[in-house]
Curated annotation (Swiss-Prot):
Active site per the UniProt annotation: 126
Entry protein name: Cyclic pyranopterin monophosphate synthase
Family: Belongs to the MoaC family.
Keyword field: Lyase, Molybdenum cofactor biosynthesis
EC number of the protein: 4.6.1.17
Provenance organism: Corynebacterium efficiens (strain DSM 44549 / YS-314 / AJ 12310 / JCM 11189 / NBRC 100395)
Amino acid sequence: MSELTHVRADGSAHMVDVTAKAETSRTAVAEGFVRTRADVVDKLFTADLPKGDALPVARVAGIMGAKKTPEIIPLCHPLPLGKITVDFERLPDGVRIEASVKTRGVTGVEMEALTAVTTAALTVYDMIKAVDKMAVIDGVRVLAKTGGKSGDWSV
């Protein structure tokens, strides 16, 4: 089993030293879902919600979330993010959200991709809760990453 890099021998947390690492191109893709009723899906994709057109707002929120990741996840390194995309796929029971993040840096962007997805999902939830208080956010996960010492992988 590998050691946790954010925990010192005495058990205290610290920010990992990445100053000696080589700068490489890195990407991460994450997904998440907002589950809701079919009639709410229709409203979501026709911009017919009481709070307005949710998907453009959620896209911008996801992008902002990725950029703010080191401010809300305590041990994340601030990174120069070169590209962030947030996309939506209509499903019969909700919406699938996918975020892709790219950088050239010394550490990966998985947390930024996850934060983009969750921030977008929270925004969708906020904008549909007036019409569906039972909506659910689920299935948030990293789908793929490239670059860095651990190499490339995908689910």
